[in-house]
């Protein structure tokens, strides 16, 4: 099994006039299809993120602190996205729900805030992945009466006098906007038509829209273009984490019988006491005991894994003390050139987006003469038969594909075994 690359961005709408507008335009420009859940039309909120590359929650007339149809399901989606760091963007009600999902509290404000008004960029905005470059004072459209108390660890990005929380970030993947940065002229007209009594409290709402939108548009488009680029860049990572997170707790029990084969494979690396070993895509840490045994107490063992829940599983199995665990992308290792003497990787190379790039990166961090061991506890033919498909001639692990790919990356293949009970390829770093 392997993660399926995300195919779309899930947008949850709560009202017909509160669509994604400029957000949707940016996603489309980045080649990201949008799947819309229109709760206002009776669409059920999905039970899971599925293959979504990002989650966008729009505004609506409901209150985030009151129960409404779909609220529980939306909070569950938000918490799932936060856990696996799938990018999230919440607008107005969506921002308040995001805060609630992370442990904050939404509540009634001091009265409605409707119409055009400035927000002030907070100091943290200048270094934010989305808000960097936004001016200190930005004219935006307000249309809300509620506010929120931010959850612990949130970063404030924008505020105003009446409503101190106007934009915030959670971690490095989730943003909440209380104001309506997404609007264009069609959106302003739709809001005014849907809520005429509220619009009447801001007499210049529609008349001043062209002027305010002209000032807003460059920054609006830049923010959402950055969000779309971030989603596209992290799509594979999002797929991997979404796929493996719910499986992590039972991963070790499911494949416990494979342990001896992992140990036997590690012995083929020829590691020496005091050496430096790296397990890329370490999962629940099944190879870490054998790697530690080979390099001894004076050696170094590193375990790299992209899914946080897998590192939690490693600790649960009592293996966290055997290695230094790093959460990182296998193709962007946080290691110096020549940092390790041996690299072990099980069931990973044929699932990364760019196997050639992975082999080059692993060569970069390997010392001259270092060993790379690619392993799987079953052979290619057995796995293909298990999944009811023929052998793939384009499989990166096929010898006719793997040997030249290794050579191009600076490795020399010196052992290739594709048996029924294991796959093993051993290569040496040559240049």
Name each model feature, range by range:
Residues 24-89:
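Flexible gly/pro-rich beta->alpha loop and the following alpha-helix that scaffold active-site loops
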Residues 102-186:
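Pocket-forming structural segment of enzyme catalytic cores
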Residues 235-273, 286-290, 310-313, 371-397:
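Conserved class I S-adenosyl-L-methionine
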Residues 278-332:
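Class I SAM-dependent methyltransferase SAM/SAH-binding core
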Residues 331-342:
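A short acidic, Gly/Pro-enriched loop at the edge of an enzyme's catalytic core
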Residues 342-354:
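A short SAM/SAH-binding and catalytic strip from SAM-dependent methyltransferases
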Residues 356-368:
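A short glycine-rich, Lys/Arg-flanked "PGG" loop and its adjoining helix->strand segment in the class I
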């Amino acid at each position: 099994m392997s993660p399926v690359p995300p195919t779309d961005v899930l947008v949850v709408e709560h009202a017909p006039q509160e669509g994604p507008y400029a957000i949707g335009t940016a996603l489309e420009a980045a080649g990201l299809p949008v799947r819309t859940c229109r709760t206002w039309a009776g669409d059920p909120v999905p039970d899971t993120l599925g293959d979504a590359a990002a989650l966008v929650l729009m505004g609506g007339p409901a209150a985030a602190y009151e129960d409404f149809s779909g609220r529980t399901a939306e909070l569950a989606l938000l918490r799932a996205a936060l856990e696996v760091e799938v990018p999230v963007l919440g607008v107005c009600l969506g921002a308040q729900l995001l805060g609630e999902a992370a442990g904050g509290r939404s509540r009634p404000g001091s009265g409605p805030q409707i119409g055009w008004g400035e927000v002030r960029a907070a100091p943290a905005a200048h270094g934010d992945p989305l808000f960097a470059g936004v001016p200190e004072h930005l004219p935006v459209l307000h249309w809300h009466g509620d506010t929120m108390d931010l959850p612990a660890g949130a970063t404030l990005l924008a505020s105003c006098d009446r409503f101190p929380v106007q934009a915030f970030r959670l971690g490095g993947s989730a943003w909440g906007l209380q104001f309506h940065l997404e609007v264009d002229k069609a959106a302003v007209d739709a809001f005014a038509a849907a809520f005429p009594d509220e619009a009447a409290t801001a007499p210049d709402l529609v008349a001043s829209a062209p002027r305010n939108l002209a000032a807003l548009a460059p920054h609006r488009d830049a923010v959402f273009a950055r969000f779309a680029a971030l989603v596209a860049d992290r799509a594979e990572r999002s797929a991997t984490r979404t796929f493996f997170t719910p499986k992590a707790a039972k991963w070790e029990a499911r494949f416990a019988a494979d342990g001896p084969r992992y140990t036997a494979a590690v012995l083929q690396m020829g590691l020496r006491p005091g050496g430096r070993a790296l397990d890329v895509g370490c999962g629940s840490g099944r190879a870490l005991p054998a790697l530690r045994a080979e390099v001894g107490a004076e050696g170094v063992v590193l375990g790299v894994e992209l899914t946080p829940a897998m590192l939690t599983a490693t600790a649960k199995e009592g293996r966290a003390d055997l290695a230094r665990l790093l959460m990182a992308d296998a193709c962007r290792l946080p290691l110096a050139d020549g940092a390790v003497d041996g690299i072990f990787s099980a069931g990973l190379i044929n699932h990364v987006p760019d196997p050639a790039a992975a082999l080059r990166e692993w060569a970069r961090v390997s010392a001259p003469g270092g060993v790379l061991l690619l392993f799987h506890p079953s052979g290619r033919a057995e796995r293909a038969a298990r999944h009811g498909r023929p052998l793939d001639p384009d499989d990166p692990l096929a010898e006719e594909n793997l040997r030249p790919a290794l050579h191009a990356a600076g490795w020399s293949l010196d052992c290739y075994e594709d048996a029924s009970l294991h796959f093993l390829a051993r290569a040496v770093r040559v240049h």
